[in-house]
Regions:
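Cytosolic juxtamembrane amphipathic/interface segments immediately preceding
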Residues: 1-7
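Short N-terminal secondary-structure initiator segments
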Residues: 8, 28, 210-211
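Hydrophobic transmembrane helical bundles of multi-pass organellar membrane proteins
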Residues: 11-18, 41-47
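Hydrophobic membrane-insertion alpha-helices, especially the h-region
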Residues: 13-29
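Hydrophobic single-pass membrane-insertion segments
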Residues: 28-37
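Inter-heme linker and motif-flanking segments adjacent to c-type heme-binding CXXCH motifs
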Residues: 39, 44-213, 222-467
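Hydrophobic alpha/beta core scaffold segments
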Residues: 215-217
Length: 468
């Protein structure tokens, strides 16, 4: 009898433990509260991660609901989560493998090899053992599934291994804006150095003057002096006022209250949140939330810190929370500091550490010293946060804004060619330089030591000579 009672007690304890475990698992997977505000929830989610996340998603791995929008989300829900974040980028890239290609009945048989209508067919999360560059979870030679006859159709490709399709300067699955044949031919003869080497300049005040929505009644676009600041008498410091006076804000009539006063109650806010910046800098703010620096905020998590990065970072900056003022400062809003010094204050990878001794850095120093024209220097931001054209269709004019989504020109590296490299360099030189990994690590100090034959192949095919 005693053995039976002991068995029943053991069973009850096991059932209770199972119920508690199930409750903890359910809470960890399906609660939508911010995990960072609930340490126990964060620990539960970490414990139940089915595998390491990719470098693109690791920052938001505790915000499970970002991708898993419902409990046991079906394929359509997961696909919707992918396109919610990445859909606009694919449209802008003129995606070469869009959904319409595979819903065309003529291509139906291709789906028997790989279901390219679903992002997760090629990008499976939590599977580090099969994940390669750009979070791809297909074998390197997956192009053969649909393009097995390419060696016959293009003699120049005969004998090339299918694992080389995605080599630098050749092909990308989605974004080929700098790689398609007509583009290669159009820029085939461009020299390594272009005659006009100036980056476009962002003129926010000029843009604001053209926007009917800008509150010009409260902040007329006229310069302000020290006596015209509108901060409470007991609030401003000499340093804060001095910093503000030297900014584009003061020169454009943007007073202290534009950032520090609550728009509803007019109460003074000592430390405005990033939302205050977004009031005027909406494009920059939105793109910041799409990149590595700001994506955690978009997922409802706390700010990114360098300690959370997977790239080498400076130890002294490990716990620095990233927001607008981290790089720009709280009153002087220095775009020059944000363009280089702020970057090198955190990043400690080979490419970043080599910047100061690079030709690009020398051009930047010459511009800062007024020994070269404005727009001729090359800072970290010149390449990784380039000026991007934006058209206000409702007002029928266009302007330039600073793209704060670093990923927009980062991977694959050919995405950088049109908005960045071709501001100064010819296409062939740019393709070769980006394909030279050692040169990239040296921050482009020197000439490329590799050659990408894409342009050569396109020219030979156009002329009807060579292997084409």
């Amino acid at each position: 009898m005693g053995g039976m009672r002991h068995g029943r007690v053991t069973l009850h304890l096991w059932l209770a433990a199972t119920a508690i475990g199930a409750a903890v698992l359910a809470a960890g997977l399906f609660m939508t509260e911010r995990a960072e505000e609930r340490p126990l929830l964060a620990q539960v989610r970490k414990a139940f991660l089915p595998g390491a996340t990719t470098s693109g998603h690791h920052q938001i791995e505790l915000a499970c609901e970002t991708c898993h929008t419902t409990a046991f989300a079906d394929a359509d829900s997961m696909q919707a989560a992918c396109t919610r974040c990445h859909g606009d980028e694919l449209k802008a890239a003129d995606d070469k493998h869009p959904l319409t290609k595979f819903t065309d009945p003529r291509n139906a048989e291709l789906l028997t090899s790989i279901d390219a209508t679903r992002c997760v067919a090629c990008h499976v999360e939590h599977r580090p053992e099969i994940t390669v560059l750009m979070a791809v979870t297909q074998p390197d030679d997956y192009c053969v599934l649909c393009h097995r006859d390419i060696g016959t159709e293009r003699p120049s490709h005969a004998g090339l291994a299918f694992a080389t399709c995605a080599n630098a300067g050749c092909h990308n699955f989605h974004d080929n804006r700098a790689l398609y044949e007509d583009f290669l031919l159009r820029h085939a003869a461009a020299p390594a150095q272009l005659p006009r080497q100036l980056r476009p300049l962002a003129r926010f005040a000029e843009t604001a003057a053209m926007l009917p929505t800008y509150p010009s009644d409260r902040y007329p676009l006229v310069p302000l002096d020290r006596t015209q600041h509108d901060a409470p008498a007991e609030t401003p410091t000499v340093e804060a006022i001095a910093g503000w006076l030297g900014t584009a804000h003061a020169r454009a009539g943007v007073n202290c209250g534009a950032c520090h006063r609550d728009s509803t109650t007019s109460a003074w806010i000592a430390a405005p949140a990033a939302e205050a910046c977004a009031t005027c800098h909406a494009l920059e703010s939105a793109s910041f939330g799409q990149g590595k620096h700001g994506m955690r905020g978009s997922a409802g998590l706390g700010p990114m810190t360098p300690a959370q990065a997977r790239l080498p970072m400076r130890r002294a900056a490990a716990d620095t929370a990233l927001d607008c003022t981290t790089c720009h400062g709280a009153h002087d809003f220095s775009v020059r500091r944000a363009a280089v010094d702020a970057c090198l204050g955190c990043h400690a990878d080979r490419h970043s550490l080599a910047y100061e001794d690079s030709p690009h850095a020398e051009l930047w120093r010459r511009e800062l010293a007024s020994d070269a024209p404005e727009g001729s220097g090359v800072s970290c931001a010149t390449c990784h946060m380039p000026r991007t054209e934006h058209r206000y269709r409702e007002y029928d004019f266009k302007t330039w804004f600073v793209q704060h989504n670093q990923n927009d020109t980062l991977r694959p590296s050919e995405k950088m060619i049109r908005p960045v490299c071709q501001s100064c360099h010819g296409l062939s030189f740019a393709l070769d330089a980006l394909a030279d990994t050692e040169l990239v690590d040296r921050n482009f100090a020197g000439a490329p030591s590799v050659h990408v034959p894409s342009i050569d192949m396109a020219v030979a095919r156009e002329r009807g000579t060579g292997t084409e």
